[in-house]
């Protein structure tokens, strides 16, 4: 009899068996485990397994039903379990397909749970936060899952990651993206789930929080800190590699996992239409309306600041001469003053006067933890001032700060890709594959995507001519001269330009500013 342990180690198998039963399969769980084991990773392998399973069934005198439920039939039986969306023409919103046809996705807040039908199906239902030890060989040791003893997000019990169960995808993100918990003809496992030898991982890990470089020099994923800026792409990569040589910063493989899950769940290419993200928080020259001496606090008009916001104080604009990148911790009413409040913040005490100005920069990490649903933003999903969470990942793909992607770059307008995390660099084309078949357009609103068939997870803008409310609904910047690094998603001042498909390919490797950051990429 087949080993049914797959049902305790592979969440996708649980879903596949339940769905197959719902569609008429009458075999046992052990028989179905054999079918999945024989199914293989592509149609050719499935066909071979099918013949073997049918022959075995005949020899054993099993019922015609069991014989029909061969490897290929098993894949067909779960065919209705893909979740997809189809886009046609210029509207950013699409039509849900497959088992998601009647699904609803309404993000929640800190007071409303919204409605999200994807919470009940894999792979979304299997995503969970965990505290993890990052091993030098690239593997991950889970110390505690959220809700278990020992789970804490300050880094004292390891990095905070999101575990994602193995799933499969098909279609281009801008045309007909589909997600399935089980292998199906025409589907592939995302690059993030493939080992260097081609075998599959049963799970992968994403950072739960935007990247922050700690006192140890390493790039972290923890709550309650200011995500790092003002570093070059090489400096961020060096900080990630302190964990081990195969660690890096965000890649197209990380993007692929999140993008397929997000676009299918949202049902639109205009991700900001569902959750705006931190794209309109930025403000300078906020007046200091009262003086304070030697306090870790500042007095401002009511409504200007909230706990979790990152601020600096100086003489105006982005000056930080008084206080640098502090996190607002509390807002207190001032007795007898209905117009102003006292905002306390982290760090040492300072002296502020009414000659000073506050720079409201972005949100600190962990500021979406108050959301009571799997996806949503505290207070508002539409005001552009609050962090959002998507199945445990905070501010993924867009908003707050640009994110570097390190596995591809432009050289004189042509994309080059590297599949070896130990060889990312921006000084030459060595160890990179030239994607000469991808012709990139000039600057403009992105309309659609293209990919090299060898690297289908890397999908880049093909045409421009859209708008902020049509097609991909994100902007595309490019400089076709010299070597250009990849920035994705936009920052807290980019407004409607921001989004998962918002790319900036204009900067060289020496670029750095507070708006640029990087997330940790975990190989194991």
What are these regions (language model features)?
Residues 81-90, 260, 401-409, 430-524:
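C-terminal, surface-exposed recognition/capping segments
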Residues 76-186:
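N-terminal module-boundary/linker segments of secreted carbohydrate-active enzymes
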Residues 334-346, 406-437:
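Compact beta-rich and alpha/beta scaffold cores in large eukaryotic transport/transcription complexes
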Residues 1-77:
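Short, low-complexity N-terminal tether/leader segments at secretion or assembly junctions of large
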């Amino acid at each position: 009899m087949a080993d049914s342990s797959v049902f305790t180690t592979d969440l996708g198998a649980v879903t596949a068996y339940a769905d197959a039963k719902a569609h008429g399969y009458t075999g046992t769980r052990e028989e179905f485990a054999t079918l999945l084991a024989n199914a293989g990773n592509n149609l050719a392998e499935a066909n071979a397994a099918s013949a073997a399973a049918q022959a075995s069934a005949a020899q054993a005198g099993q019922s015609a039903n069991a014989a029909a439920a061969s490897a290929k039939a098993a894949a067909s039986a779960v065919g209705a379990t893909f979740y997809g969306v189809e886009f046609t023409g210029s509207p950013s919103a699409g039509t849900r397909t497959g088992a998601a046809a009647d699904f609803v996705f309404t993000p929640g807040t800190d007071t409303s749970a919204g409605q999200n039908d994807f919470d009940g199906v894999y792979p979304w239902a299997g995503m969970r936060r965990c505290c993890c030890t990052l091993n030098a060989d690239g593997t991950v040791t889970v110390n505690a899952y959220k809700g278990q003893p020992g789970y804490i997000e300050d880094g004292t019990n390891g990095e905070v990651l999101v575990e994602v169960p193995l799933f499969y995808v098909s279609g281009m993100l801008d045309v007909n993206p589909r997600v399935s918990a089980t292998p199906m003809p025409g589907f592939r496992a995302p690059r993030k789930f493939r080992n260097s030898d081609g075998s599959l991982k049963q799970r992968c890990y994403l950072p739960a929080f935007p990247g922050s470089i700690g006192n140890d020099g390493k790039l972290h994923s923890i709550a309650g800190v200011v995500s790092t800026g003002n570093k070059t792409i090489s400096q961020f990569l060096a900080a990630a590699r302190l964990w081990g040589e195969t660690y890096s910063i965000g890649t197209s493989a990380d993007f692929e996992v999140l993008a397929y899950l997000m676009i299918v769940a949202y049902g639109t290419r205009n991700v900001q239409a569902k959750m705006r993200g931190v794209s309109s928080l930025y403000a300078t020259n906020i007046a200091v309306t009262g003086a304070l001496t030697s306090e870790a606090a500042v007095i401002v008009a009511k409504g200007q600041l909230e706990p979790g916001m990152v601020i600096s104080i100086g003489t105006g604009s982005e000056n930080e001469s008084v206080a640098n990148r502090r996190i607002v911790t509390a807002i207190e009413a001032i007795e007898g003053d209905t117009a102003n409040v006292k905002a306390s913040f982290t760090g040492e005490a300072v002296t502020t006067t009414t000659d000073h100005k506050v720079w409201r920069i972005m949100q600190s990490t962990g500021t979406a933890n108050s959301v009571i649903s799997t996806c949503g933003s505290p207070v508002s999903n539409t005001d552009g001032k609050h962090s959002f969470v998507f199945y445990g990942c905070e501010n993924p793909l867009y908003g707050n700060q640009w994110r570097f992607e390190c596995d591809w770059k432009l050289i004189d307008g042509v994309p080059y890709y590297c599949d070896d995390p130990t060889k990312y660099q921006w000084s030459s084309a060595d160890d990179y594959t030239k994607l000469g078949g991808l012709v990139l357009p000039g600057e403009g609103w992105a309309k659609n995507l293209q990919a090299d068939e060898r690297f289908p997870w890397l999908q880049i803008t093909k045409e421009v001519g859209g708008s902020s409310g049509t097609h991909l609904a994100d902007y595309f910047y490019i400089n076709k001269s010299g070597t250009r690094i990849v920035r994705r998603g936009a920052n807290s001042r980019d407004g409607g330009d921001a989004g998962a498909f918002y790319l900036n390919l204009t900067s060289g490797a020496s670029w750095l500013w507070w708006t640029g950051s990087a997330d940790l990429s975990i190989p194991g």
